[in-house]
Amino acid sequence: MLDIDENAAATVASEIVAAGGNAKAYGCDVAQPESVRVAFHKVLQEGRVQILVNNAGISHVGNLEGTTEPDFDRVFCVNVKGMYNCMQAAVPHMKANGGGIVLNMASIAGTSGLADRFAYSMSKGAVVAMTYSVAKDYLAHKIRCNCISPARVHTPFVDGFLRRNYPGKEQEMFEKLEKSQPIGRMAKPEEIADLAMFLCSEEASFITGTNYPIDGGFLNLRG
């Protein structure tokens, strides 16, 4: 498990171990190639990398005119370059060892675009395109590559985002986000995790080059 916050990653790893699983945590800034290289060197001391889940991401509030070049670069570096860096580290290893699985976390923003989320929408569109390209390029090497495109998911990331950008109006904005979903609520993290587990399992061995919306009807059922 890699995270820019090594202590947070260690906490999750401890929970996994306590539940009977195996996990180790390493600090890593996915936007920095050297940080990724060092982290993957440590990981590879433990054995093969068979599955890579790219889940690091940040957002930014702003339309085209409200997005400065530093804003754009910051989102791109984490959401796009971060996945690129991790795939650059993992895919050659998978290729040399007979195959593997790459799962990228995209967003419905990458398919439909979201108002006031110019940089974020752009970055997630790039994630979808990268997924398709990697799936095509490495099919012969038995590497499957898919992505998941969630709508809004209720996580601490969302709570922090609302506190930073809508101080004093967090609950009002939270309710608006819930109502924006045709299904009437945001997704639970466990619902995204269940799909991720499936796509990384043998049950999904015939699935590659696919973008999976998990959006409570956001793309197709809004009136």
Explain the meaning of each model-derived region.
Residues 1-11:
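Conserved glycine-rich Rossmann-like NAD(P)H-binding loop of the short-chain dehydrogenase/reductase
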Residues 6-7, 27-39, 69, 190-191:
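The beta1-alpha1 cofactor-binding region of Rossmann-like NAD(H)/NADP(H)-dependent oxidoreductases
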Residues 63-64, 68-73, 177:
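Substrate-binding pocket helix/loop in short-chain dehydrogenase/reductase
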Residues 87, 123, 131:
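Active-site helix of classical SDR
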Residues 92, 136-140, 205:
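Alpha-helical segment proximal to the catalytic Tyr-Lys
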Residues 107:
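Residue(s) in the substrate-gating loop at a strand-loop-helix junction
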Residues 112, 197, 208-223:
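Short C-terminal tail/terminal secondary-structure segment
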